[in-house]
Each structure stands twice: as structure tokens, then as C-alpha cells.
Amino acid sequence: MKKIVYFSGEWCAPCKVMLPLVKEATKKHKVPLEIYDTENDDKLAIQMGVIQLPTIIRVEDGVEMRRMVGLHPKYEVEKFVSAS
């Protein structure tokens, strides 16, 4: 099963731009989305090696398949989420 894991921070301006794009793409493609604020819950971010925000990770069957870091246009987010 595929899911998208999204790491952000309250202070992160690019995160605020990316979150609506990620939410829209995951809803459109019916992909589960998990959102983590690294300010409040950094354990998973550390475990997954997240060092920049925003970081979006595509996980399939518990294995990281790909990650996207930083600000990206809508079409790239769509492609990232919809890829199999």
C-alpha cells in the first residue's frame, strides 16, 4: 500500500505553500497522507533522515520509494503522488 508522508514546520514558508498542493494531489489520487510537524514530533523525521523542509516521502509497503525536498510546482507534486 502506498502512502505519502509529509514533514513540515510551523515557521517554514515553503511548507505552507506545499501543503495544500500535497493535500489536493493525495485526495485526487486517493493516496493516504500522514502529516508531521517536526517542531512537535521530530522522532520520525530523525529516523527517516529528514534534514530540510518541506520533505515529502512516498512509501510503498513500508519502504521509502522516493522523496521530494523543497518547493515544487503543482504538476511535479501531482506526478510524485500519482507515480506507482
Predicted features by range, described:
Residues M1-A25:
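Local sequence-structure signature of Cys/Sec-based thiol-disulfide redox active-site neighborhoods
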Residues Y6-F7, T26, K30-K43:
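Thiol-based oxidoreductase modules, predominantly thioredoxin-like and allied folds used
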Residues A13, N40-K43, Y75:
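Short alpha-helical
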Residues K23, K27, V31, D61-E64:
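A structural signal for the main folded, soluble domain(s) of proteins
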Residues T38, V50, G70:
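Conserved strand-loop elements at the edges of beta-sheets that form or border functional pockets
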Residues M48-I57:
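Structural micro-motif
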Residues R58-S84:
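Non-catalytic, surface beta->alpha helical segment in thiol-disulfide oxidoreductase systems
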